[in-house]
Each structure stands twice: as structure tokens, then as C-alpha cells.
Amino acid sequence: MQVPMSSYLVEIKPQIQELIRLLEREFDYVSVLCTDVKGTTYRVSMHQTTVGDYHFCERGFVVRAWQDGSYTEYSFNNLTDAADLAEKITSALKSEFQALKALGIAQMESPLVQEEAITKTMQNEIEIDPETVSAEEILSHLRKLCDAGAAHEGILEFQSTVSFARVNKLFLSSKKDLMQSYAFSEGSLSAIGTENGKQNMSYRSCSGLKGVEILNEMDAIVEEIIAVLYAKLHSDPVTPGMYDVITAPDVTGVIAHEAFGHGVEMDMFVKDRALAKEYIGKPVASQLSSMHDGAVGAQQVSSYLFDDEGTLGTDTTVIDHGTLVTGISDLVSALRLGTTPTGNGKRESFERKVYSRMTNTYFTAGTDKLDDMIASIEHGYLLESVQSGMEDPKHWGIQCMVGLGREIKDGKLTGKVVSPVTLTGYVPDLLKSISMVSDKEELFGSGMCGKGHKEWVKVSDGGPYLKCKVRLG
């Protein structure tokens, strides 16, 4: 089925167009982003059942205006008479300009955006609309998954969770008329178990531009998550050192996200907080590796027609056969840098500022087979079950927490597991050590990405299996 447009946004569109017309009497440029995001999260564990709003639910508006070389914004969620609202917004924005001037605070100037006229809409397709399925049916399915996991020996807690989201956005200016409605789903299973006084946990997820059909994907994860849990319960600590490793697609994705995801967010170029700014056009990785980011390069939870500034989504080649080509950018950063925006301007909500943010970030597939990659390693590990990652864009250090590593000796998996594993290194050293790339890629979109300690947005990341050399501890 095709995801329907928000009836609310369709209804209020003429009023927003009138608001823009009135504000343009006072400002040289005016745009309005209208958001209507809804969704539900269902969770069943061995001890409780909960149903609540999806994390990013919102309904509101952001006005952006340009005057005297600077942009300013006003957000609100109470839509009143257009004339009254225009007067209120004009007064607030003019007062802000005057206050800054009175205090002697210099404003960061930005060129006036030159928009091209465009009218475009997008609606994605899903199989089963969550709004046509009762909460009881969804919870019943989750309960069966929970019961199946809890039935295994040593399980202290098992939890099944699914979220259904519907994102509706309308972007209007004097030249742009953009509207989109897309749905995505996220499912996850987690288990905590114990054996011989040792306790551990495992987690698996799935996501995509899907509806209730994602529950069927979750059915296949139960036995997988239990197997991983038991492997971790029988694991040993890794001996610290440098190793040849193969990163599973989920680990590859976090490396992409941390290494040259945050590192090439171009609002950091404006602030001179990213080393990547000095390496555009230079080799930073193995010639075997290429990396992309973009809302249209892959079909996952961060695939959209336009970003929160009305820039159409793109497929950006960040690294091309080892060479750093470009970064990813919001509109205002691009205007300040004299570059082309890439459709990566995203807000946590209508109440928050736009930043350069990732969408779907991934290494592209190569030509190698996983079996051949394993056979090429004398002693190392197959790393899987990523937990978290962190990178320093200013100095290119990277750290990833990985759930487990499967030992490889003389080209074969030994059955021995080490856990937990911390992967660390200097980003160019890690990426230049890539010597094999598998022929299939996979993306994951069940998590969120923050900017520093805040500004959470939906992203996905992934890629193929990579063979590289890293430090483990």
C-alpha cells in the first residue's frame, strides 16, 4: 500500500502559504518546515508489557527568514490566524536582530539562498499498514517471540520490541512546494542470560521502509540471539594487540559512521573542528574502499525526498576508491563554504536547530567471498554484534565496542569466542589497511545518532564484510 499524505498538512497548507506571503513583506527570504510525525512503540518482556508513543513524535512548524546577511528562525506548534502569527513572528525576529546589535554581538553572515522553482511529492510503499492492525495482534506476536526466547535455559530476561513510525513533512517557500510521507519500522530482540555464575546479554535488530511485515523478520532472530548469548557466556577476554580482523556488516557500518560520517559533517568544516577539511582530494583509505552517504543511495530509515531545509536528498560519494571526495552538508554550511548542499540538513525536531547529519552511511560492496577472506587470515578474529562507537573528528581517533570476536586460525574459525572486544585505532591507518571487501552489503537502521551528547536523529549504516588490521583490547 502507498503511505497516505498527512491530512493535517494538506489542510493547513494554504494558511502556511499565506503566512509566507505576509512575512515576505519584511524579510528577503522566508521558508516554513511543517512536521507531522506519529508512531507507536510496543514492548513485551518477561516481566512487563508497554505501549507508548514513538520517540520522535511531533507536530510543529519552523519559520526561517533572511535579513541583513543572516538567517534566523522561529518555531511554534500553535497555528493561529496567519496575519496575527506573521505579526508575532516579525516582532520576535526583529527584536532578536536588534538585541544582538545592541549587545555588539557579531552575527555569522551567510549568503542569501538562490532557490529554483520546484514542486514535488513522495510517498513510499509498505505491505501492511500498522494502523490497520490492532495493538492486541502486535502484542500477541511480540509475546510469542518473548516466550520462545524465555524458554531457553539460563535466560533471566528476554525482550521483544517493535516501533512503527510515519513521517510527514511539508516544506514551503516562494519557490518550493515539497511534501513527503514515508513509513518505517524497527524491530529488536534482547536477551540476558547466566551460566556458571557468569552473566551476559545479546541483541539483534532489523529495520526498513516497512510496516507490520517486519514482525516476520523478527521470528528468525530468536534462535540467532540465543546462540550468540551462549557463545558470549563461554567466551574469554581477548589478548590485547594488533590483529587481522574481518568486520561483519554491522561493525563495518559503525566504522563508516564514526570514521568518515561524523568526520565529514561540513558544519564542522565551518568551525574548523574536522581534520577531513584538509584532506579533500587526498587518499585516506585503501583503493579497495568506497563510501557513500545519502537519502537516495539506499532504502532504509533515513531515506527521504528532501531534508529539513528543503534540499532534495542525494547519493553522495564520500570516499571513492580510497580518495576523500567531499563531505556531507546542510544548506547554511554549504552557503558559507561556497559548496553544494547534499540534503543532509536534519533537525531532532521542529524545536531544534539544523545540523549537517548523516542519513544512510555505508561502504560499498567489493568482489571477495567471505570464505576466502577467512581463509586468508593466519590469526585474527571475525568481529560481530556492534554495541557502540565514538570518533574524534579533530584528531581522527576511533573506538568501537563490539559484542564478540570469533577466532580465526590458519584460515579457519576455531569455535573460540572472545568478548567483549574494543576496537581502536587511527582512522586513516584503519581504512588504509583494508585488503579485502566482500561482495554483499547490508544496512542497519535501528539506532539513533547524536551530535556530541544531544541532537538525536534517525540514521542507518552498514556495508560489506571488510578485512583490515586493527588494535583490539
Region roles according to the model:
Residues M1-G473:
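N-terminal small-residue-enriched
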